[in-house]
Amino acid sequence: FSKSKSLIAKREIKPKYFKSIALRATIERGSLQGIDPSNISLSLGSNLHSVSYPIDNRGQFNFISILRKKLNIKELSDYSLFEKKDFISSILSEISKQVDSNIIKNLKDIRCFPVFVSSEVYQPINKNTFLIGDAFFSFPPTFAQGASQSIEVAHELYKNLENSIGEFNHERIRRTKMIDQKSKFNYFVFH
């Protein structure tokens, strides 16, 4: 979660734990039986959704699972928890109840992360300061929108500066709130 917003606001802006864990790994195309390698694959489960998609031309895929999971304050403050083999194994065990065991046993470079989201849209006081990406607003992970939002917003900012249009922040806040609502609805539907 970006600390840029807190630095610019001159106050601590804390993210909100979204009661979810993201598991990210890589997997070879041959281990993804029944999945079209030329498309993004989305699987929905109970309190779980998984996505796999190609990342190169050599047959490597990213595998992402978002698992609904409550953690207490002690667990959330222990950043090393998400690197511990026991914790990762417990997350894999929960995911394996709904994902093909052939996929689970062939995952490589497995990492876990807590999912944090923004609870408010922060608008910098200085009109010449623009935040983009997670520094502006962190969405729930249902649209794979992080990178796409950053690219889209960077382009909109460029156009705004090029044409001296002053509507950038107003329109962006409206759009951010709409995307956030859709993301939360998708998360509800996916789980």
Model-derived segments and spans:
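Generic secondary-structure microfeatures
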Residues: 27, 56, 67, 96, ...
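Short, conserved active-site entrance elements at the starts or edges of catalytic domains
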Residues: 101-106
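Conserved mid-domain beta->alpha element of the FAD-binding
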Residues: 86-88, 109-188
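Conserved FAD-binding catalytic core of PHBH/FMO-like flavoproteins
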Residues: 1-100
